[in-house]
Amino acid sequence: MASTELSLKRTLTDILEDELYHTNPGHSQFTSHYQNYHPNASITPYKLVNKNKENNTFTWNHSLQHQNESSAASIPPQQTYHFPIFNKYADPTLTTTTSFTTSEATANDRQINNVHLIPNEIKGASETPLQKTVNLKNIMKVSDPYVPTRNTFNYDVKISNDFFDNGDNLYGNDEEVLFYEDNYNPKMQWSLQDNSAAINNEDARAIFNNEFDSDDDDISDDEEDEIEENCLQQEQHQEEPLLSLDVTPISMFGSDQKTGRAKSSSHLFNEYSYVDSNMDSISSVVSEDLLDERGHEKIEDEDEDNDLDEDDIYDISLLKNRRKQSFVLNKNTIDFERFPSPSTSANVPSTATTGKRKPAKSSSNRSCVSNSNENGTLERIKKPTSAVVSSNASRRKLINYTKKHLSSHSSTNSNSKPSTASPSAHTSSSDGNNEIFTCQIMNLITNEPCGAQFSRSYDLTRHQNTIHAKRKIVFRCSECIKILGSEGYQKTFSRLDALTRHIKSKHEDLSLEQRQEVTKFAKANIGYVMG
């Protein structure tokens, strides 16, 4: 077998063993250490330093004696240091940092290699080329690689990076150019300089403060002034109160009555204009009429009447808690209310049809008009002596008129809700926005109406389906039966949630599992009672 193939079988154990006993190239040692030593054919033959010692076999007793007499003078220690220990396939000298002194090299040179070469393999060993090794001692440029390098600088070292060296990073997130201030410090862009004299004996805090001075001036004085002005303007807008209904600038009632009578019936089509925004149309109509008919009035009164134009938040729907349909009254609305024409009465439906809720918006509008006509919410208004008195009186009349219209509209809607159920089953009464549903089913025992009241129609329906059902389902409490016997059996519950409340209140000492058992017993033993 070729010597190169044999050299592949040298293991790491052999290498560590040689290093442990300070083996030197070309020598064998500790022959007598292995009592029953036999040459290992797998060990790679090496080039010996002294070829006359190739086939020598020594015992441990006279090996040391031979070391004192051997070829220390024939080969100098410097030459033995450069001989390789291993072949090219397992050369650990690439990472070795062992340095030999003269005494160590002389002592190691006296050692004897314990490898017995086969004569046929000597030629192959001599032809194995020597590998060029790399020593960490030369790479690290230090006397001792295991001694950590010490900082020999007597001043602080500034650490930075090359972030600002890249031109793409000169813009921040707010699209503003960095370093536009006059106190820009270019030392921020310096790279790591260990031997730079420019930063010698500088304090780290001083460097930091000088580098980041511009951060304190991110917001200029002009921007601060603008922010303060905006805040003051917002506070002023928030502090402005909403115009109350007492100052509503509508003076339609103070106009001449003859003007309304002379108008044609075609204006009735525009009598009620339903909108969902503000009262701009009211103010525009009123302002035009005032300019035509009352040009002699003062400018102060006109400014007072036009205050509503400046407030878009105002809405008639603010009269109630919830938003309702707001409507606009034209100038001649009141005159047509006082003197209804035949066409008006023909277009307005009777109040008997308002019992049911109409899906169309026009029908609900007509019901509002009819209610206002029958109730007679408006009175004849005398013409005031002054414009100020007439405007105040007209505003009060408009408020009363609007409130009555809205209340009649809400009462009509509330009265139409319970019409879905049979009238004999229950009745409902409206108290403002709160509706009360009353059960009117006759009690067979007392021969009187039940009279149970509920705030929701759902509760009333559930009451009638359970209490007044012909065949009622009842639940019994097993704990009451155990304690009271027949009296506890007579105690029944129409709903399961009532039984649950009974268990929590009357049987507080029961655990959760025991309560579940009582509920299961009630479900399994449902009773029926004929009503």
UniProtKB/Swiss-Prot annotation:
Keywords: Activator, DNA-binding, Nucleus, Transcription, Transcription regulation, Ubl conjugation. It is found in: Nucleus. Disruption phenotype: Mutants grow slowly at low temperatures and show partial mislocalization of nuclear antigens. Residues 338-432 are annotated as: Disordered. Ubiquitinated by UBR2 in the presence of UBC2; which leads to proteasomal degradation. The keyword Plastid does not apply. GO terms for cellular component: cytoplasm; nucleus. One of its GO terms (biological process) is positive regulation of transcription by RNA polymerase II. A motif (Nuclear localization signal) lies at residues 382-398. It comes from the Eukaryota. Gene3D superfamilies: Classic Zinc Finger (3.30.160.60). Residues 394-407 have a biased composition (Basic residues). The keyword Nucleotide-binding does not apply. This is Protein RPN4. It comes from Saccharomyces cerevisiae (strain ATCC 204508 / S288c). The gene is RPN4.
